[in-house]
A protein has these predicted regions:
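Conserved NAD+-utilizing ADP-ribose enzyme module
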Residues: 1-107, 156-160, 169-267
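Glycine-rich loop/turn
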Residues: 56-66, 121-176
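Short, extreme N-terminal leader segments that mark the start of a protein/domain
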Residues: 91-135
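Hydrophobic side chains in beta-strands
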Residues: 115-117, 166, 198
């Protein structure tokens, strides 16, 4: 069920139930912050919260609509932190859209990036597809007890999805997995894996893309063909060693990908 409140204090007490949050709850908070467009996570024992700034993100109404659609489809308990006026404005603007509509919006990136450790990349190639953490765990293909998203406060059902990002985010995740804790320093050395570039337009058209108000993701599995455009590894981008930093690996891979993308788009 989806609830709306005008304001919310980020602490462990759920304003709807009066009790502590359990993992079934998720929050969408509309702000006027100048410090970010979108951000997500859990602070001060509060439920997982997606924050979207009206001042910095012009597509905030679409984000609200996607969040509502995602929560309704997955029967999640959700809290919208915004005025009734802003909620009505978002609903009116979103009319005719769906959180999983099979098209890529003008505001969405044409390429989605997923980063993975090298040993996982070998398994992905063997399987011919990406799989969610929960699917891999069910198949006993991984030994880790919990996904890294748990450290970030992710809801448990997020492990049903393959997450995508851009910039250096994926490399931060790979490095953090290796270190067993969240490492935000993009200049620390780590063992590079594979940085995978996917055709987002084709993924959307074929019904794979899911939007939750903050992320673009895919549920359960994604075949490599015909969606994978290119896989960057330390060898394919010309590094002298598998050891690098998240910043260098991401920058070098993205730079080389631009020429590959031009060839791909001209086909």
């Amino acid at each position: 069920m989806i609830h709306r409140v005008d304001r919310l204090s980020e602490n462990s007490i759920n304003p709807i139930t009066g009790n502590e949050y359990d993992n079934s709850w998720i929050i969408f908070m509309l702000t006027d912050s100048l410090d970010y467009r979108q951000m997500s996570g859990s602070n001060n024992a509060c439920a997982y919260t997606i924050k979207v700034s009206r001042k910095q993100y012009k597509n905030w109404k679409m984000a609200v609509g996607d969040f509502i659609g995602y929560c309704e489809a997955n029967k999640k308990n959700a809290i919208l932190v915004m005025s009734e006026e802003n909620l009505k404005s978002a609903r009116d603007h979103y009319e005719g859209h769906r959180y999983n509509e099979p098209l890529l919006r003008d505001s969405e990136p044409s390429v989605l990036v997923h980063s993975t450790p090298m040993n996982s990349w070998k398994q992905i190639k063997s399987d011919g597809m990406l799989k969610s953490w929960n699917m891999l765990k069910t198949e006993k293909a991984i030994s880790e007890e919990q996904p890294i998203g748990i450290w970030l406060g992710d809801p448990t059902d997020f492990s049903d999805y393959i997450m995508f990002g851009g910039d250096v985010t994926g490399e931060i995740i790979v490095n953090s997995k290796q270190q067993g804790k969240i490492i935000m320093d993009i200049n620390t050395e780590y063992l590079t894996g594979a940085r995978l570039y996917f055709d987002a337009e084709r993924m959307a058209r074929d019904g794979f893309l899911v939007r939750d108000g903050c992320h673009l993701k895919v549920k359960n599995m994604l075949p490599l063909k015909p969606y994978l455009i290119w896989a960057a590894t330390w060898e394919t981008i010309g590094l002298v060693s598998q050891i690098s930093t998240p910043r260098i690996f991401a920058e070098q891979a993205d730079k080389q990908f631009q020429s590959i993308l031009q060839d791909y788009n001209s086909q």
